[in-house]
Amino acid sequence: TPLHSSAASDVYKRQQSSRDTARNLHLYEIETSFFKFLSPRCKARVPACYFDEFDPKTGDGILILEDMLPAKQIPQMNGCSKIEVSMVLKEAAALHKSYWNDEHLLSYPWLTYSVSEERKKFVTDLLPVAYPEWKKRYQGRISEDIFEMGDILFSNYSEYSNVEEGPMTLIHGDLRLDNLLFTDENKRAILLDWQTAAVGLPLNDVAYFISTSFANPNDREKEEERLVAQYHKLLDVNDTYSFDEAWSDYRRASFVGFIMAVLSAMIVERTDRGDEMFAVMAERSAWQALHLDALSFIT
């Protein structure tokens, strides 16, 4: 095996509470398995993996990945430009096309945790406890319009989450600026942090990324239909998946960022930066969902 002059390692050893959550959600197993089994045929830009190991007994693992310096990260709360959004959507299209309707994905148990009865029960049991506490935490910080939207969404969550139609592919599951790097070389974005990779609906990644990446909701409103059309063209499966279908799935998926922000805020270790970041993510995604009338899918 050749030695590499530059590499970056990720060793999964954090505070016990964080490790317990990660173990319960299979996060470390998912990421190491992605690099072992699926990254070699991923057309999106991801770091090369030189070594991976996961111990299911302890939940510890190691990844040694390609060093991506001098690539840069854009802070989540800052948001990014429409050009940078386009760069990421190009990679999202490449990712989704690589595994489009590939039923072999279902043979990997670690890739189906997010759609398993175990995960559905986890979320269904957590939401009635987490959402009221989330509202209490952000009272006075988050708009009442957003709270009202959340009340309706989570009262109808079983209906919202019960989606049985649509294209299937490998999705990143947490496609946002904190999990990306940008490089001037070939003007490409690099996708990192695959702990939430899953079999899922492709527009979940797209809506989540667009909603959380524009600091100004007016900019998002002006650009998002064009950006989704660009993604759909790059996906190049028009014969089986029309733009109208993609746009409808995008509108429905606009809740994804809000749900992720609420749950993440309540299960990860709390910090001042984390509190504000999850508030910003929830706001951006909620304004997107309200603008796109996503509640019409469940009411």
Language-model features: where?
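Catalytic activation segment of kinase domains across protein kinase-like and atypical kinase folds
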Residues: D178-F209
